[in-house]
Amino acid sequence: MFAIAFAVVLCLLVSVDAKFPEDPKPCKYGDGECIMKLCNTLFSENSAEGDPGLNLMQLDPLKVDRMVISQGESSSPVGITLTFTDNLLYGIKDQRIVKVKGFGRDLTAKHEVKIVTKTFSLVGPYNIQGKVLILPISGTGQSNMTMVNVRAIVSFSGKPLVKNGETYLDVTDLKITMKPESSHYHFSNLFNGDKALGDNMNVFLNENSEAIYKETAKAIDRSFGKLYLGVVKGVFSKLPYAKFFADES
């Protein structure tokens, strides 16, 4: 999940910074097919362990320091504040980019990446307070939130930013939409460790997982969008926009 937001820009950065003879070559502006193939190759071969020679950090599992999902709309049967801290995200290595749009010369244009993956599992400490389909829920402990057969769309846009005579892409807007085929949840230590209540709630959550995800999808997408806007801004601030692509002069 974490790397979805900046998969393409990270791959472009890798291809620019790689120094050895066998390194992948940068793609031309707007060459979606090239960008897609480059990224899929890099992720499948290097995401599990990383590759210092390619300047590619470990992506599977990936550390997620903190993420808050807040669903508080009064009309919704689900109203929760769910906080994940020091989690690990598994599944990046199996993701595949299936379509890329944008990444042309126009810095104000929209960029879009479509991705599919078998599973995404976010594992680690959590805190939750609120209600789920009218039932109260509270707890602090370990959690596992897994999404299966996920289709995701990442889109972002920006504006030119001139620094020291060079033009950078200043990313100003990023959105993520995820559509899993199914989702599964497990939260330990619910209701102050009451095992009976906790077990029943976990059963309830999974029996109603489709309805629960539908109610929380927008909140989940917003949380990831806010989190990774800063990440993508940081990637594009490293180099002038033109440096991410092959020299066509």
Curated annotation (Swiss-Prot):
Induction: Starvation and circadian clock. In the heads of entrained flies, levels fluctuate daily and the cycle phase is delayed with respect to per and tim. Cycling appears to be linked to the endogenous clock rather than light stimuli.
Domain of life assignment: Eukaryota
BP-aspect Gene Ontology terms: adult feeding behavior; behavioral response to starvation; circadian rhythm; feeding behavior; male courtship behavior; mating behavior; response to starvation; rhythmic behavior
Record localization: Secreted
Keyword Signal: yes
Tissue: Expression is largely restricted to head, with limited expression detectable in cardia and crop. In entrained individuals, expression is observed in the brain cortex (region between optic lobe and central complex), photoreceptors and antennae. In asynchronous individuals, expression is seen in third antennal segment and male-specific expression is seen in the brain-associated fat body.
Predominant localisation class: secreted
GO CC terms, sorted: extracellular region; extracellular space
Extent of the signal sequence: 1-18
Pfam families cross-referenced by the UniProt entry: JHBP
Function of the molecule: Participates in a novel circadian output pathway that conveys temporal and food status information to feeding-relevant metabolisms and activities. Involved in male courtship behavior. In the brain-associated fat body, transcription is enhanced by the dsx and fru male-specific isoforms and repressed by the dsx female-specific isoform.
Family: Belongs to the TO family.
Name of the protein: Protein takeout
Gene designation: to
